[in-house]
From Swiss-Prot:
UniProt source species: Bos taurus
Main location: membrane
Compartment list: Membrane
Domain of life: Eukaryota
Membrane-spanning residues: 77-97, 114-134, 178-198
InterPro entries reported for this sequence: TMEM267
Name of the gene this protein is made from: TMEM267
Protein name: Transmembrane protein 267
Keywords per UniProt: Membrane, Transmembrane, Transmembrane helix
GO cellular component: membrane
Record's bilayer topology term: Multi-pass membrane protein
Length: 215
């Protein structure tokens, strides 16, 4: 576990100018990107709409993880790209549920696919964490559950502005206000960063991989 000094340092770092500017940039990107996706030229083309929407999920996932770890060396880009992949790959469940590679079928489902159930996120994250602990991978890959949590949660929050959050088996919420989506997305990297410090994950990342955290 992190010491009190490390916890205090985490709090100060998370309020740094660089970190706050990055979060403001992320919030601005969310606002502009989702407004641009409403343009008729995008909305009238199913493939363009789907690819654009998925690309925004990908960028938000990458940006969020970049805020968490900072970009200090070339290997950091690998993690950032992985975060973007995790944020966008969720939508593959549309095709799995439809049982077809047809985009029309994937967009005309009778219900929401299983990876869009928000209670799946803590289930998968905790399962991954326990699996890594069992196979003694918790040091080398300690960042992975957090990356998965941030990437998938950002995807669900963004989808929530249209459909609400599906909290199976408890039902779903009303659609999230756009302003709440922007605030949660911008704040999520900082919230995770705090908890990672409190649990010692950040110190483990630094000692094992030489990652210099600047959030």
């Amino acid at each position: 576990m992190a010491s009190e000094t490390e916890k205090t340092h985490a709090l100060l770092q998370s309020c740094s100018t660089e970190s706050l500017l990055s979060s403001l940039g992320l919030g601005l990107f969310c606002t502009v990107a989702d407004r641009l996706l409403q343009f008729p030229i995008i909305q009238q083309n199913a493939w363009l709409r789907a690819l654009s929407d998925n690309s925004v999920h990908c960028v938000i996932g990458m940006w969020s993880w970049a805020i968490v770890i900072g970009i200090r060396k070339k290997t950091d880009f690998g993690e950032i790209i992985l975060a973007g992949f995790l944020a966008s790959v969720i939508d593959i469940d549309h095709f799995l549920l439809s049982g077809s590679l047809s985009l029309k079928a994937a967009l005309s489902l009778p219900r929401r696919p299983f990876l869009h159930c928000s209670t799946v996120i803590p289930t998968v994250v905790l399962t991954l964490k326990f699996t890594m602990h069992f196979f003694k991978l918790k040091d080398s890959w300690c960042f992975l559950p957090w990356m998965l949590f941030i990437s998938w949660t950002s995807h669900h929050i963004r989808d929530g502005i249209r459909h609400g959050l599906w909290m199976c088996p408890f039902g779903k919420t009303s659609p999230l206000p756009f302003w709440l989506y922007v605030i949660i997305t911008s704040s999520l990297p900082h919230i995770c960063s705090f908890v990672m410090y409190f649990t010692g994950t950040r110190q483990m990342m630094s000692s094992k991989h030489g990652i210099h955290i600047d959030v």
